């Protein structure tokens, strides 16, 4: 009666009589009474136009009580629901049939009902049914799902990908998105497994890869140049020797996961009508867990223990600072405690960062090495031989005359070897001319003579060497003064100005003849 009423509403036909609507409304009242709903007696009084409106409202309440909703569509019909048939009956095989028997039966029926061989419309529908049945039975997962849950594991002919045991027990192992996403891993939304970033899944067994370890080691400059072998100690997770990585005590067994009921999957609902299936985070998708009283006492059920490990690292010649070396299989061991009976594991890798100490006087630039050599100015001017250190020992270098600061000598092929090749860089010697800041009187005298010899008029001289005169002039004037008995005391600027006047000449002569008379001229003037 309810379906007839809906049909009449969808098609726009109002063929219900007052008596029919009254009967429907009476049934809804009786149903509401069984559900302990109180309906006012005044609602039983209705008339021609209100009959259908009240009946529709009461039927909506009845549908809500039965957890059922309907949608009236006037123009577009919903897609027909595909009712799945028994694939075993379709192919004519038993549930214990092998894969080869199922395949043989499929080829036999497909050849018989193929549209090219049988153009009948019924044969085409039969061929589609045969193909769908074979797709279910040839896939081990789909076959297992159908054997366990029947057609409920398929929606509109499509495999949902998970077990549906939770529907029989109040959606066990499922959680709602409206309740704070408990137990939901967002990585599964994008295709990542919740079993950890290092877990890789296979159709027949699980392979667990341990986490990688990062460490650092410091070496000397010459060890990086020549290569070395260094020992590195670090903390690592190793497989437990008591349980061999299973996490169980001897003779113990795993139990079914309580969160997912052994399915390894959890179902999450997205209102209004979407659902998502993710890997169970309690068991890691295996469907089994280790009971607390069965866990290994050495590793507490984890399958791994922490310990110190030492590995020997071969450092190749020519390695540079901050270079990372990879040691395969020297990382953490993977635990198989959450894996299945065929789970396998592989340790991670060790990534060692090499730090090179700086050298006191060698400067590295890639494979080239630079050494700054300091030479005195006499060697720079006259040339000579200089002993400098290199990567292979001391070497005597010839310094060309006139070498200045910034000049460079290149020793090709004497640098650092390029890693994993036979090529070497260059060794450069940069010259830096050093000049003394403090001079002895003898050194200053020699330099002044050198300045005179080079006609360097800008060099500063002491008082014994008048500026602006060369060595020959000073020598001749000195000899003439000694021959005449005249002192060689230096003269001031005022006296030089008076050299050309007669008064100046007699004044100087008087001072030389009567030195006592001129000791305190100011005093004589004051007394007079």
UniProtKB/Swiss-Prot annotation:
Residues 1-66 form a transit peptide. SMART domains: DnaJ. Residues 455-528 are annotated as: Disordered. A zinc finger (CR-type) spans 227-308. It comes from the Eukaryota. The keyword Methyltransferase does not apply. InterPro entries: DnaJ (IPR012724), DnaJ_C (IPR002939), DnaJ_domain (IPR001623), DnaJ_domain_CS (IPR018253), HSP40/DnaJ_pept-bd (IPR008971), HSP_DnaJ_Cys-rich_dom (IPR001305), HSP_DnaJ_Cys-rich_dom_sf (IPR036410), J_dom_sf (IPR036869). Residues 462-488 have a biased composition (Low complexity). Residues 86-150 form the J domain. Keywords: Chaperone, Metal-binding, Mitochondrion, Repeat, Transit peptide, Zinc, Zinc-finger. HAMAP family: DnaJ. It is found in: Mitochondrion. GO terms for biological process: chaperone cofactor-dependent protein refolding; protein refolding; response to heat. The keyword Repeat applies. It holds the Pfam family DnaJ_CXXCXGXG. Residues 513-528 have a biased composition (Basic and acidic residues). GO terms for molecular function: ATP binding; Hsp70 protein binding; unfolded protein binding; zinc ion binding. Gene3D superfamilies: DnaJ domain, Heat shock protein DnaJ, cysteine-rich domain, Urease metallochaperone UreE, N-terminal domain. This is DnaJ homolog 1, mitochondrial. One of its GO terms (cellular component) is mitochondrial inner membrane. CXXCXGXG motif repeats lie at residues 240-247, 257-264, 280-287, 296-303.
